[in-house]
Every structure is written in structure tokens, then in C-alpha cells.
């Protein structure tokens, strides 16, 4: 429980995204039932699960959902008693942040960084923390230390016998890898698995021709010495796998729903801001946010199905169906009255 309840889902990032997107419509369902006890139960279960999951995405989405739904209730002048569970959840989430599984997970990451910070200090000495500026010449002594750091510390398998930068150095060369990382010696970057995946595909991308960059390259390009470096962040992955053309079309399609909602807001005014719109907007924003900052969202069918649902809800709210009443002529009305 100290590191959250991850594990029942195939991909932890995808699990967090699904939970974040499901809580707003769950609360909307309870609010539309207009039963206070039902709202209390759904708020407890929804926010409790987000808090206990132990990722930054679920924790911050819980805070934003509680605050967002609270504002929507006040905006739509709903009974104040429905605000109480959301207000209580918001206070508890903020007050118990220091005890959350998310904080415990972050502390463990800091412990790993501290281990490599000591190794970095042993190699870099007084030059630790060197800040490279693009275009400047690196002092020979500092560059020699950086080369030792990248090869002797990060060029060998890590604590879990997994490669750090060794396979990338073998494929792209030491100088290219050092340049990709900006000649940094920071453990927060060099020991960051998420960043490593992005750097690996970035180096691959730099070697491609114009046509490949327009259409993207295949998934096999993310494999180095049998290790898969498929990026966790979805937006860079869209660019690398589908090129400028595919990524541009995807973003334009997503932007259409945002444009539709903003246009409807401009035309219909404050009355357009309803609980239904708020729940859809939260789901939509969480999907985009998870794609950029967490990942495994846009490219997983079992996750992006909820993104599609949010987009459909946004479109439905922006394009209400107007039912035309049947026209009755004046003679028919007179005839009916006589009868």
C-alpha cells in the first residue's frame, strides 16, 4: 500500500489514465440522480481509488476533479449540500498529500538518484554540476570527466541489471549521446528511463531523411540490442511513428472538438457551462494531459476509447439536437375546436 495499488492493470500509466477519466462521469451520474448519499459513496470510492493508486496523474487529477466539479455546482446554482462531499474530498486530498502513496514513490525515486549522485561526485569532483551552453567549447578536463561518467557509471547495467546508456552509446556513439543529453551530469536526467526512451528515438529521428520524417518510421526502430525503447509519452511517439503528416492530422482532429466547444461557448454564453460539459471537458483534458505527461493513452485502445467518449460528449454538448415540432395549420385548429 505504501507504493500504491498499481499492478492489476497491464500498463501502470494506462491504469492511471483510465481512472482519471472515469471519475468525472461517475460523479456526474451521482449528481444527476440528485441523491446526497449516492454522491457521498461515489466521491469516497472515486477519490479514494485515485489517492491510493499512487501516481502523480491520479493524485493531481483527483484534486482537479474535486475543485472543478465544485466550481460547476456553484456556477449552476445546485443545492449547497452537494458541494460538501467535494469540498471535504478536496481538503483531505490536499491535507494528506504528504502521506500519500505518490509521495512514497517519489521518495524511492530520490533514493535511486542519490545513489548515482554519489557516483557522479566521485567522477566529476569539483566540476559536478557543469552547465553546458550550446556552441561553447567544453574544457578538455571537464569533457574527459564527462566521458568517464557516461561510460564507467552510466555505460554499465544499473542496480536491476538493466542497461542505462551503454546500448545507446554502442549504437549512436558516445559523442552523439552526450550531445543529446546536453553534456549534463545530472542523475535526474541520466538515470531517467522515460527520458532515455525519448532520447533514443530522437537520435534515430536525426538520422532519417525528409520523406521518413513526413510519414514516420516503424516500431522496430525503437529496439536497441533487444531492448525496447518505445516512448511512454504519446505526443513524441505520434511524431516519430506517424511523421509530421500523421501527427498533424491527429492534432487537428483533436483540436476540432476544442474549437467546437469554444465556439458554442461564445454563441450560447454562460448557460453553456453545465455539469455535463464540465465532466466531458475534464475527461478530454485528462486524456491529453496523460498523453503528454504520463503516456500509454492515445495508442492503447482500452484507454483511448474513453478519450473517444469524451470527444463525443463534447461534440454532443456543442451541437444540441433541436427537435422541430410538427406544424399545425389554422384550419385544423379551428376544426379540432369545433369537435
Predicted regions mapped to residue ranges:
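Membrane-interface junctions at the ends of membrane-embedded or membrane-associated helices
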Residues: 29-40, 71-82, 263-269, 314-339
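A membrane-periplasm/extracellular boundary helix in multi-pass inner-membrane enzymes
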Residues: 76-185, 206-207
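Long extracytoplasmic/lumenal interhelical loops at the membrane interface
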Residues: 154-242
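Alpha-helical transmembrane segments of multi-pass inner-membrane proteins
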Residues: 1, 10-76, 93-103
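Transmembrane alpha-helices of multi-pass inner-membrane enzymes
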Residues: 66, 280-288, 296-335, 339
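Loop-to-helix entry and N-terminal half of a specific, functionally important transmembrane alpha helix
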Residues: 240, 260-293, 311
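Hydrophobic, aromatic-rich transmembrane alpha-helices
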Residues: 22-30, 247-268
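Membrane-interface micro-motifs in multi-pass membrane enzymes
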Residues: 1-22, 233, 239-246, 296-305
